[in-house]
């Protein structure tokens, strides 16, 4: 027992620190991004991918009740573990179904519940598995428990890492599977065993069944491994590896044939859009600068460690050179590291919108690159008096730096402003609510958390001011949500909608309650 404590106390401490920070920010999460609400709806609704499908695809002129909204995002009695519905919903969407199956399974364990904690609990478990894969990967590559712990804390408490966990979406699973694939490749690098090749194939299939962007890192990683093996002229290894890797990718067509339509569709999130971005050379600089900036901002602690490590390596160059003549520099770790650096510009160019989530799965490998520098430093210091103590001191200093970064810059997807939105809406929860849109589900999905405050709401378009009067009855005021996004939905001008209401009804006063992305919310009164 004492030996176990001595060996693993640092490992346990790093994971506990990450857990504590994850819990802290989970408690602070006050709202959800629209895609997070899609996660609940696509996973838990019964053969109704989007809110408008609650009303057969056309919500105009209809009333949507709180119960119908709740049924869209929660597993209700008798609907648990309905994986067929999840498969159908994802076939209608733009992503494969693996994460949504897991989400539905977790939601089915707590039927009748709609809470951020359902998604955060699942994401936390997957995040811990991702950190475990990262730990095992670095330990396999560099043979140092302390360096592996440094990787866990540098990534686990990074802005990008915590954002991955806090976004209730498939990206945390995508990251875990990318790390698992890298770990399997690392195992093959160090001790090739044919029985690992089927696991490579299964991991590739699982990654593609999670998010199509898995293909980029997986392709470059497998390609780097093949080139490495060819360089060593160990051709027999490829007879085991290549069929399983290709088979895993091709099995996607059997497991989810709708992927063909999704990848070739002419939508914003599709293969068609990716090809448009590829041919639009003028946007390359903007896209590359954005994503490089996200990495620089989201891995500040790792970058600081890199700068210090490089300076130390320059000062200790002679000792590193001497150590390199006696021990391996672990340059084969570049098989795992370099594909991430190649994937970054590819994703930057092809991503449907500029958003950090598209690079979440490759972020850990930038930390692995930092660990390579730490390994070289370890070689230079090895054999010195109290080298083990120095190693632990460096690890604790890195942990303190990572904690400082997490304290200074909060991760994404917390939405503190949603507390104010909820408070404002709650003041008017007893009043009628009207949603103005051209039957677009996106803005209503974004506003679902606030719409749940109302008993029901009426959906109409810009010309439906007269038709809504039957719904409003003789009330003195009502809440109006106006769909304002020109990119994602109707793009209404609120002033025109309000003027139309004044011209066709007795309601002549309007006060802006708040504005949130795709919609503006007003209180309309007589």
Question: Predicted regions span which residues?
Answer:
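Transmembrane alpha-helix segments characteristic
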Residues: 149-151, 199, 204, 242-250, ...
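Interfacial juxtamembrane loops and adjacent helix segments
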Residues: 44-95, 107-112
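Transmembrane-helix motifs of polytopic, lipid-linked glycan transferases
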Residues: 118-142, 180
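Signature aromatic-anchored transmembrane alpha helix within multi-pass, membrane-resident enzymes
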Residues: 13-16, 374-407
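Hydrophobic/aromatic-rich transmembrane helices and adjacent perimembrane loops
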Residues: 337-338, 349-382
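Membrane-interface helix-loop-helix junctions at transmembrane boundaries of multi-pass membrane enzymes
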Residues: 3-8, 135, 139-141, 145-146, ...
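Specific aromatic-rich, kink-prone transmembrane helix
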Residues: 105, 133-136, 153-157, 161, ...
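Perimembrane helix-loop-helix junctions
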Residues: 182-199, 204, 216-249, 458
């Amino acid at each position: 027992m004492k030996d176990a404590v001595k060996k693993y106390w640092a490992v346990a401490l790093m994971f506990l620190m990450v857990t504590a920070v994850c819990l802290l920010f989970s408690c602070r999460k006050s709202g959800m991004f629209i895609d997070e609400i899609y996660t609940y709806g696509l996973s838990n609704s019964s053969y109704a991918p989007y809110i408008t499908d609650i009303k057969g695809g056309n919500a105009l002129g209809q009333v949507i009740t709180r119960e119908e909204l709740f049924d869209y995002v929660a597993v209700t009695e008798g609907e648990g573990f309905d994986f067929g519905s999840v498969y159908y919903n994802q076939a209608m969407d733009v992503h494969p179904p693996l994460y949504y199956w897991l989400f539905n399974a977790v939601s089915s364990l707590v039927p009748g519940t709609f809470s951020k904690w359902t998604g955060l609990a699942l994401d936390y478990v997957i995040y811990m598995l991702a950190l475990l894969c990262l730990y095992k990967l670095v330990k396999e590559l560099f043979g140092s428990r302390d360096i592996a712990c440094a990787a866990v804390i540098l990534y686990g408490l990074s802005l990008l890492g915590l954002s991955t966990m806090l976004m209730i979406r498939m990206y945390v699973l995508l990251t875990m599977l990318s790390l698992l694939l890298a770990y399997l490749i690392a195992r093959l690098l160090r001790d090739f065993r044919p029985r690992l090749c089927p696991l490579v194939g299964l991991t590739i299939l699982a990654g593609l069944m999670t998010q199509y962007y898995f293909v980029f890192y997986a392709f470059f990683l497998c390609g780097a491994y093949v080139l490495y093996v060819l360089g060593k002229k160990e051709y027999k290894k490829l007879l085991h590896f290549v069929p399983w890797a290709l088979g895993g990718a091709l099995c996607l067509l059997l497991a989810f044939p709708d992927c063909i339509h999704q990848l070739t569709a002419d939508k914003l999130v599709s293969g068609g859009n990716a090809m448009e971005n590829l041919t639009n050379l003028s946007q390359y600089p903007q896209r590359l600068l954005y994503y490089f900036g996200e990495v620089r901002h989201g891995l500040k602690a790792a970058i600081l460690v890199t700068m210090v490590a490089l300076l130390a390596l320059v000062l200790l160059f002679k000792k590193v050179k001497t150590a390199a003549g006696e021990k391996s520099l672990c340059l084969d770790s570049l098989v795992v590291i370099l594909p991430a650096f190649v994937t970054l510009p590819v994703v930057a160019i092809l991503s449907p919108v500029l958003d950090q989530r598209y690079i979440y799965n490759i972020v850990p490998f930038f930390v692995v690159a930092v660990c390579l520098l730490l390994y070289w430093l370890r070689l230079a210091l090895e054999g010195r008096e109290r080298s083990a103590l120095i190693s632990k001191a460096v690890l604790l200093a890195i942990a303190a730096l990572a904690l400082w970064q997490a304290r200074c810059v909060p991760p994404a997807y917390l939405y503190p402003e949603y507390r104010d939105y909820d408070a404002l809406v709650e003041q008017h929860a007893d009043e009628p609510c009207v949603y103005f849109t051209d039957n677009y589900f996106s803005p209503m999905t974004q506003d679902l958390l606030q719409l749940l405050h109302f008993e029901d709401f009426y959906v109409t378009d810009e010309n439906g001011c007269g038709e809504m009067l039957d719904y409003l009855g003789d009330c003195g005021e009502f809440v109006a949500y106006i769909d304002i996004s020109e990119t994602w939905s109707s793009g209404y001008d609120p002033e025109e909608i309000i003027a139309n209401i004044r011209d066709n009804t007795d309601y002549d006063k309007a006060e802006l309650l708040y504005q949130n992305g795709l919609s503006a919310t007003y209180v309309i009164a007589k």
